[in-house]
């Protein structure tokens, strides 16, 4: 007898995460070793989706050239940011399900965004609710585009787009920027269609299942870095973030006891009011507030 599963009763109870090679072709021109420009038309991008299986709402996603730990991290970061946009604060999932790609490396990062981490059973696509969702995206959105590549190499050839027709249309394929815009629009429409039901469901989330993600934890695991180390000055830390010199300080007086430390500054590009300062070995962390610099006149 086949086992059946029902969906969670509210959002944020279970997220399912996986990567997918988006079935949209784009053209790319590169220079070969002989200095000649060579254009290829069979390029595709990879998208990692964090899916809330309450109503298949894409709570987070990221697009890149191939699936890798950094792309997964970007998708989880997007999920954290979007949860704040929806709920007013960053929330974690009660349970997060992933595939087994780099599971030893990624487990701790998954644990940041999920109270429980459940790797899916190996070689069983039905174990992951996100797998059928990719087919939904392919048939609902990608199929309508003139650069649609089909259903994958294992599909019946009769269901695939005509290769001669694709070849004739190849010069009209978008470049990488264009296909990224197609993917972003696809995900925007998905969120828009499911937003109302998702928010209504989230209002019923029980307190014991509501897991806030602290600002410090978010910055420590997903924050961007300046690429430089900063030392404490009389006015605090003065890192250059996004090309602008900014002033930060801390109300914790023990911060001043570590004047000899060199600090890495982690920040959220969308909210620079607070940053996290971490020393070289990670043993000390301080949340810093941006200082108001008063004009002289």
Show which residues each predicted segment covers:
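C-terminal, beta-rich DNA-binding module of retroviral/retroelements integrases
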Residues: 177-297
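Short, flexible loop/turn elements at secondary-structure junctions
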Residues: 18-23, 51-55, 63-67, 100-102, ...
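Mobile-element integrase/transposase regions
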Residues: 1-46, 57, 74, 82
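Globin-like tetrapyrrole-binding proteins
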Residues: 87, 91-216
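Short conserved micro-motifs at the rims of enzyme active sites and ligand-binding pockets
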Residues: 27-29, 108-109, 275-278
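Active-site beta-loop-alpha junctions of metal-dependent nucleic acid enzymes
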Residues: 61-87
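Intrinsically disordered terminal and processing segments
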Residues: 1-13, 22, 107-124, 130, ...
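Residue-level signal for well-ordered, solvent-exposed loop/turn and beta-edge residues enriched
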Residues: 56-57, 283
